[in-house]
Amino acid sequence: MCRWEQEEFWRLSNEGAAMKIQNIPFEVTDWSQMTLVEHEGERGTSQWRTFDRGNIRVRMVEYLPGFYSDHWCSRGHVLLVLDGELVIQLRDGREFVMKPGTSFQAEDDEANPHLAFTDKGAKVFIVD
């Protein structure tokens, strides 16, 4: 990449489209050292390891086989599937089968929230 391309990349990266992360100095997270907290779904269990600082929450979540969420979620997320298979259902009836390497990005949406379920189990990385 030439100097002009680098400058253009950084200019575009720093304009309004970038996520605004505040009050979080550089920090490395060893997820294996984060406290594991279990959350019961309508059926099954999910296991969360959570980094919650500044204005963001970052989670490594494992949905155990047979998990079905106990609520519709209207909070915005970026979710990346690392392992397994997770189904995201929108209240409008659409379903999306998420496999390793796929992600979804969604804004806060009271009108069309989502929920998650899995037959096989899944491990995901979530930022919200």
Predicted regions mapped to residue ranges:
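A short, N-terminal "cap"/entry segment at the start of jelly-roll beta-barrel domains
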Residues: 2, 7-59
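Ligand-binding loop in jelly-roll beta-barrel domains
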Residues: 108-128
